[in-house]
Amino acid sequence: MANPQRAGRLAQEVQRDVTDLLLKRINDPRVQDVTVTSVELSGDLQIATIYYSILSDLASDGQKAQAGLEAASGLIRKELGARLTVYKTPELKFVRDQSVQYGNHIEDLIRKLHADN
């Protein structure tokens, strides 16, 4: 198991680099509105779970973004391998972050509560 501080630093570095790659290197329109919200690394630093959000609430846009990220994962991993100073570049797993949608839902509930009073 890796040092937790090292894993945290590496996760931040992966998040910064993936964000940079999505903005500058990936030209796929499906990932145009994707924002990387956080990265979690497995204990052995072999798997990076990348959480992302998109501006649209439509399910079809979420599926398109997921497909675009999966299609670009090979290029992203290759570029990460050149940028990171680790023995083995982690495998990338993209997961849509639901916290933004949940936050919007809570905000709507609070607004309704205030409107009723």
Swiss-Prot record:
GO terms for biological process: maturation of SSU-rRNA. The keyword Cell membrane does not apply. Its main location: cytoplasm. One of its GO terms (cellular component) is cytosol. Keywords: Cytoplasm, Ribosome biogenesis. The keyword Secreted does not apply. Coiled coil: none annotated. It is found in: Cytoplasm. Belongs to the RbfA family. One of several proteins that assist in the late maturation steps of the functional core of the 30S ribosomal subunit. Associates with free 30S ribosomal subunits (but not with 30S subunits that are part of 70S ribosomes or polysomes). Required for efficient processing of 16S rRNA. May interact with the 5'-terminal helix region of 16S rRNA. PANTHER family: RIBOSOME-BINDING FACTOR A, CHLOROPLASTIC-RELATED. Monomer. Binds 30S ribosomal subunits, but not 50S ribosomal subunits or 70S ribosomes. This is Ribosome-binding factor A. It comes from Leuconostoc citreum (strain KM20). The gene is rbfA.
